[in-house]
Amino acid sequence: MKGTCSPTSTSSGRSSTPAPPPAFDFQPLGRVVFGSGSLARLGEVARELGGTRVLLVTDPGLEAAGHPQRAVAAIEEAGLEAFVFDGVKENPTEREVAAGVVFARTHRVDLIAAVGGGSSMDCAKGVNFLLTNGGRMADYKGHGKATKPMLPSVGVPTTSGTGSEAQSYALITDERSHLKMACGDKQAAFRVSILDPEVTLSQPKLVSAVTGIDAVAHAVESFVCARRNPLSQTYSHAAFRQLEPNFERVMSHPTDLAARSAMLLGAHFAGMAIEAAMLGVCHSCANPLTAHYGVTHGVAVGVMLPHVVRFNAAAVGDLYADLAGSAGALADRVTAMLSAAGLPRTLKECGVSESILPLLAEEANQQWTARFNPREVSEADILGLYRAAW
């Protein structure tokens, strides 16, 4: 794997002394329990963390699959009490977080468990912030602003996408601006992540597709972002190697547990890479599309990623080559994955009006992940990316 300390070439063609690896400061966030059937260990894990009254944060759509019910059973079998808050919606706002806080206070919970996709994970972290530290989510925008101890928490992802269970940030949507606030603190990270591939078997094809593409985008963007380092790139590379060959397999054979396992593990690795590094302009471009048109996040990053890869090739083409042979091949591979999943490949297919592209570019340029893109990017550059994707 090529990294950030690869030898550089001189004008004579000879390799010069490799640049030293960049400095980084990374602390692993918590324990990872991986394996089929591991959801059954939720109660055991919660008890080990000292929990007695567990807030289970989930969304009502999972009830048909039985995941919240199995989580409650595992908690109760460990001799603990479970209180289910299922008021989570996609892209949670402070309204859902506030409702969760009221519910948590009413039941005097001492541990939080999230079972669901990224929205459940984000909402659970948001509840933890406000339940223990008070205030509003905007008070915690950025990193490290919690001043009081937070509750121990456990994350059980039911999708192979966000990798939120591996990150210390809660992404909560501002209801006024419709933009996402990234609120981070090491205390907000889950003490334990339980990765059970069996719970991902119930995902509908569309959910598998959009979350899987999101995970791929996480792996690709974190691998080349300005804050990349040898540790984060190890996670990014491992994530891509799990995700890329198994995405289409899951699309065509949704009950293939081996492929599902690889996707879940790959999404988690990508989440670890984000925590150790950052993302880039692809995610900056995606958020306004969701805010204005309700474009699902995975669709938005999928449409934008091939164009971002081609744009960044001048700066990090050698790194893209490490993933797929060349930047062009990587961009084409992402497009092929979108086609295999039946997802849109253009903004026009997503219903985006060409006339709004300048406004989208203005808003995307204000998103903080754009600052970590490996190639410096301006509002005009972002408009060019949107036009290319339209």
Please name every model-derived segment:
Residues 1-49:
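N-terminal amphipathic/basic leader segments beginning at the initiator methionine
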Residues 40-55, 73-78, 106:
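Glycine-rich phosphate/diphosphate-binding loops that line cofactor/substrate pockets in enzymes
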Residues 63-135, 249-260:
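N-terminal small/polar loop signature for handling phosphorylated ligands or for N-terminal nucleophile
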Residues 235-285:
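Oxyanion-binding "anion nests"
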Residues 289-356:
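Gly/Pro-rich interdomain helix-loop hinge
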Residues 354-390:
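Short, amphipathic C-terminal "tail helix"
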